[in-house]
Structure formats: structure tokens, C-alpha cells
Curated annotation (Swiss-Prot):
Matching InterPro entries: RNaseH-like_sf, RNaseH_sf, X-over_junc_endoDNase_RuvC
Positions annotated to bind Mg(2+) 2: E74
Residues annotated as binding Mg(2+) 1: D14, D147
UniProt keywords, alphabetically: Cytoplasm, DNA damage, DNA recombination, DNA repair, DNA-binding, Endonuclease, Hydrolase, Magnesium, Metal-binding, Nuclease
Active site as annotated: D14, E74, D147
EC class: hydrolase
Location of the protein in the cell: Cytoplasm
Species in which this protein is naturally found: Rubrobacter xylanophilus (strain DSM 9941 / JCM 11954 / NBRC 16129 / PRD-1)
Note describing how the cofactor binds: Binds 2 Mg(2+) ion per subunit.
Family: Belongs to the RuvC family.
CC per GO annotation: cytoplasm; Holliday junction resolvase complex
Protein known as: Crossover junction endodeoxyribonuclease RuvC
The UniProt record lists the keyword Manganese: no
GO molecular function: crossover junction DNA endonuclease activity; DNA binding; magnesium ion binding
Length: 179
């Protein structure tokens, strides 16, 4: 295990244009502490530019308020609905841009990696992941909305991945590079 010198605040983001879930955890050595969770929502009647602007402003505000040392974002997974994949990709882009502009390092995790880190089973269902998020953070109930629980799961995934790579020097989380 790591010593108590490892401290970081992690913002996890589950991208979406209607609802962007987020969760903040604090890692202190081998301990993980719940900070907050929520969702940035946009009205369905808004055009895409206005929705993306709201998401960008919301993520920027979260970064200013919580001052994370890392932002973990769920990678886009293959989706048979091309329109959904495109809009989720746009929301991801907004989150990545907000973190980049704030100078915060960004890490990406696939849904499989998140499930594996949280439940030790890459094919876990949504309810299993949510229940483990609740248990790992010592919460009385499963965080709502679902997107916010996913944001917390992504933040926890980063904390676990970061802790393991720091302890072993192997399998470092993939940070996005500024090339």
C-alpha cells in the first residue's frame, strides 16, 4: 500500500449532452473519501452549441471549485447508434477542453476498465457498479442520478489505477498527451 504522502482530488466525468454526471473523491494514501457528486443538465429544446456551452461552463466551474489534480473521463465506447456516439463525443470534447484550459491532467478509462476496477468484474451491470460505489465511499444510498454515480465510479477507477501504478511502477493510467 501507499504511504500517507499520496493525496489527490479527482474529478470523474460521465459525458453526455443531456446529462453529464460528475463525482469528486479525495485520495489520501490508501483511503478514498467522498467529496461530492452531481450532474450538469441541459434542456432538450436547446440547440447543440448552447448545450455544449452550458457543459463547458459547468465543468469549468467544477474545476475551479474543487481544484482537482486529475480529471478522469470515460472513453467513448462503440455504439451502434451513430447519433448518440457523436453527441457523447461532443460532450467528451467539452470536458477535455475545460480540463486542458485549466491545466489539469486528463486520464481516460473505458467502461470495461471502470467496471473491472470497481467490481473486479468487467461485465458487471450498472446496479453492481452503483452498489460498489456506495460501499467503497461509505454512502448510505446509491448516488443519484445514475450519471453522477458513474462519475464517481470513474473517479474511483482513476484512484485505484493511480495507486496501483504508483505502488508497482507498472500499468500507469493512460494520460492524454498534449501533442
Amino acid at each position: 500500500m501507499l504511504g500517507s504522502q499520496t493525496k489527490q482530488v479527482i474529478l470523474g466525468i460521465d459525458p453526455g449532452t443531456a446529462t453529464m454526471g460528475w463525482g469528486v473523491v479525495r485520495q489520501e494514501g490508501s483511503r478514498l473519501r467522498y467529496v461530492q457528486h452531481g450532474a450538469i443538465t441541459t434542456p432538450s429544446g436547446w440547440g447543440m452549441p448552447r448545450r455544449l456551452d452550458r457543459l463547458f461552463a459547468g465543468v469549468t466551474e467544477l474545476i475551479r471549485g474543487y481544484r482537482p489534480s486529475a480529471v478522469a473521463v470515460e472513453e467513448l465506447f462503440f455504439n451502434t447508434n451513430v447519433t448518440t456516439a457523436i453527441t457523447v463525443g461532443q460532450a467528451r470534447g467539452v470536458a477535455l477542453l475545460a480540463a486542458y484550459r485549466a491545466g489539469v491532467e486528463v486520464f481516460e478509462y473505458t467502461p470495461l476498465q471502470v467496471k473491472q476496477a470497481i467490481t473486479s468484474y468487467g461485465r458487471a451491470d450498472k446496479r453492481q457498479v452503483q452498489e460498489m460505489v456506495r460501499a467503497l465511499l461509505g454512502l448510505r444510498s446509491i448516488p443519484r442520478p445514475d450519471d453522477a454515480a458513474d462519475g464517481l465510479a470513474i473517479a474511483i477507477c482513476h484512484a485505484f489505477s493511480h495507486r496501483m501504478s504508483a505502488a508497482t511502477g507498472v500499468g500507469k493510467p493512460r494520460a492524454m498527451q498534449d501533442n
